[in-house]
Amino acid sequence: MNRSTGIESCSFTRGLVRGAGGLLLAALGLSPHWAAATAPTVSPPAVPPPLPLSDAAEQLTEIMVEAREPRYVAPTRRDQIGRIWAPVFINGRGPFRLVLDTGASNSGVTAMVALALGIPTDQSPHVMLRGVTGSADVPTIRVDTLSVGDLAVDSPILPIIPDALGGAQGILGSEGLVNKRIFIDFSHDKIAITYSRGERSGHDFVSVPFRSNRGQLIIIDAMVGPVRTKAIIDTGGQTTIGNLALRQALAQHNIGFHGKPDQIQGATLAVESGELIATPPIKFGTIAINDSGVTFADVYIFKHWKMTSEPAIMIGMDALGTLDTLIIDYRRHEMQIRMAKSG
């Protein structure tokens, strides 16, 4: 069965992940053993009391998180598979290791982080946390600031997500990224989040335009073999997942008849059966990602996004991690990609 204000460049760690299962980190109720977890090293000992929730904050009732629970995780600087960890400061404390998740509408943290910040969760407001395999009602905390690089979010409401992140301490979602530029250098394990100045791509980069919905999902037009496909760029997921409409379209071209059974399990413990298939290259712009393995399943999130009638795919870090450099410019609505050199 199957990520202090002013930091502009910082290291990230990727976890090696094998297999196609292990799916969403959306929403498991807190288990009673979380308080025994070891808190990260943080500075000042005194923590101000949590801020009261405003009327607007109380209206927040639903949050999307797309990061998936890994099967196997081992920090590595060599393998191009795994999620991106960004060092994030919360209320000036940290840094905490949050997974950069372009499939998440909001950031979230584990109960261990809430404990380290000294913020109780037992009587906090709840939100509906939605993920790949299901949804659940979870508590929230409100903090003063969340910052990394040029990204600074004031008074964010953070859902408490399960401590099943393979060593990460939460999710860095897309709120606050509307005018930002994310630079990810896989070859040197570097990430920078800065204000976008509308820079054009370099001569050795390929530009791929994207569109986004209200939740800031990154949506591009792609081809999987001969099939036109709507693709979601999902830096929070280790693996690539296709819907059944894409599976059926490939089958019409006699592609993918020799898959093997797979299971997708989210942090809600909901399990959905899937089929792991070696597919033709995934192409977008002039980029081609070869040796693609896609798990096809009728997962909850495709239904929630109303992406069941036409071919759709969530491109995870097993594919994105094969790139040399990935730039996501939210102001330009453009990805700028440099492929890794072969050999």
PLM segments and residue spans:
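Twin-arginine (Tat) signal peptide motif
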Residues: N2-G21
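Pepsin/retropepsin-fold aspartyl endopeptidases
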Residues: N2, W34-G343
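Bacterial N-terminal signal peptides
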Residues: G19-P32
